[in-house]
């Protein structure tokens, strides 16, 4: 299939986005509006216009999505698309770390995943428990005239499980603080308010985790992002090298980016052609620190950006979209786009309430049998 055939498959709004010549572009893509198809068309269009595929970097949130985009571009352009890069934010940053290790003063490092982090925090909690046990034993024993007198406390001491969050919760708290770029104290208030009295103990555990990583030359996923983001914002030589190889940056699912990822994108503004796609009316990674301001305030942060809208929905009927539009109209945020159904009219949605998920499942099965 030629690029002309691909462009002919797009609707006018998709085609305008795919072929824009703006330096910076934000595409507000409503649900089911062909977002991925538009990104594929954008990459294919750039290559067809003479842009070397190796100068295009696409970043998204899953390896599967990245692989799908590259495969679809290759299906349209064949060998012409060879060298096109699509990856997650972490893989993109990891490639920079490994290509320029001396810049980051990293002579050698090992990447640890979430399971490794959980195990490290589990061991740190164990050390904390041992320390408390020794302190409690010292307090409960007093020596007088060569004899040891043991006093029975009225109330049993809290266990470490009661004082500190679970290892998984500590990992999530640590990551949330890094990704939102807020202090540990504020992250604790937002994520685990019930553990605020243990702030000093949690802070000590976090310091222990940082010390162990440094000692063992470990980098977790948050380190990978923050190392690269910080250095790109402060090291002109590194930024020059990276932007030489990345002249076109396409960002998928912009609404799910967090403050740390925005910090990573900032240095590219003005040096690369930035093309961001996302839905300003949805976000599924709030628990990871996703910040809707990255998309809602994009025009303020990048004043020369062109903002385009994809509002033709290919997934739902108009009755479903009318309900969605009605909800968005009542939001405090200003949503300018209104989704229109390509499929036309349909059945008006009906609200059903259930006592539990099993009743819900039984209803769905019963309803499907009737259709």
Residue map of PLM features:
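Conserved helicase NTPase motor core
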Residues: 8-19, 23-27, 65, 85, ...
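Conserved RecA-like helicase ATPase core segment
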Residues: 2, 6-7, 45, 259-362, ...
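Structural preference for long, well-ordered alpha-helical segments in enzyme cores
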Residues: 17, 39-46, 57-61, 65, ...
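Helical mechanochemical/support elements of P-loop NTPase systems and associated helical scaffolds
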Residues: 65, 69, 88, 117-120, ...
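Basic/charged alpha-beta structural segments of nucleotide/phosphate-handling enzymes
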Residues: 118, 122-218, 236, 274, ...
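P-loop NTPase Walker
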Residues: 1-107, 240, 322-325
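Phosphate/oxyanion-binding loops and surfaces in catalytic or ligand/nucleic-acid-binding neighborhoods
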Residues: 76, 99, 103, 127-131, ...
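Conserved P-loop NTPase-based nucleic-acid remodeling module centered on helicase motor cores
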Residues: 55-60, 64-165, 352, 365
């Amino acid at each position: 299939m030629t690029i002309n055939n691909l462009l002919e498959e797009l609707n006018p709004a998709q085609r305008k986005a795919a072929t824009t010549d703006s330096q910076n572009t934000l595409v507000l893509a409503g649900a089911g509006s062909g977002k991925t198809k538009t990104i594929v068309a954008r990459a294919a269009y750039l290559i067809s216009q003479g842009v070397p595929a190796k100068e295009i970097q696409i970043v998204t949130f899953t390896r599967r999505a990245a692989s799908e985009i590259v495969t679809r571009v290759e299906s349209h352009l064949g060998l012409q698309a060879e060298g096109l890069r699509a990856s997650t934010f972490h893989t993109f940053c990891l490639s920079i770390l490994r290509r320029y290790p001396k810049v980051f003063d990293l002579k050698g490092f090992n990447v640890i995943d979430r399971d490794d982090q959980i195990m490290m925090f589990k061991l740190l909690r164990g050390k904390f428990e041992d320390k408390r046990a020794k302190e409690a034993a010292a307090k409960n024993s007093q020596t007088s005239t060569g004899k040891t007198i043991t006093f029975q406390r009225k109330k049993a001491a809290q266990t470490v499980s009661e004082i500190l969050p679970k290892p998984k919760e500590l990992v999530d708290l640590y990551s949330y603080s890094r990704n939102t770029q807020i202090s540990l104290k504020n992250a604790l208030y937002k994520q685990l308010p019930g553990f605020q009295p243990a702030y000093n103990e949690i802070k000590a555990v976090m310091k222990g985790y940082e010390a162990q990583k440094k000692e063992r030359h470990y980098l977790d996923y948050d380190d990978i992002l923050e190392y690269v983001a910080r250095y790109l914002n402060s090291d002109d030589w590194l930024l020059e090298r990276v932007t030489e190889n990345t002249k076109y940056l396409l960002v998928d699912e912009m609404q799910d980016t967090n403050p740390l990822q925005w910090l990573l994108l900032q240095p590219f503004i003005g040096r690369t052609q930035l093309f961001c796609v996302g839905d300003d009316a949805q976000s599924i990674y709030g628990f990871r620190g996703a910040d809707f301001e990255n998309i809602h305030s994009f025009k303020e942060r990048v004043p020369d950006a062109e903002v385009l809208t994809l509002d033709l929905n290919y997934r739902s009927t108009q009755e479903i979209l009318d309900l969605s539009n009605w909800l968005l109209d009542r939001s405090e945020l200003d949503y300018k786009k209104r989704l229109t159904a390509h499929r036309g009219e349909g059945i008006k949605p009906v609200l059903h309430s259930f006592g539990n998920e099993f009743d819900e499942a039984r209803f769905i099965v019963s309803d499907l049998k009737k259709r």
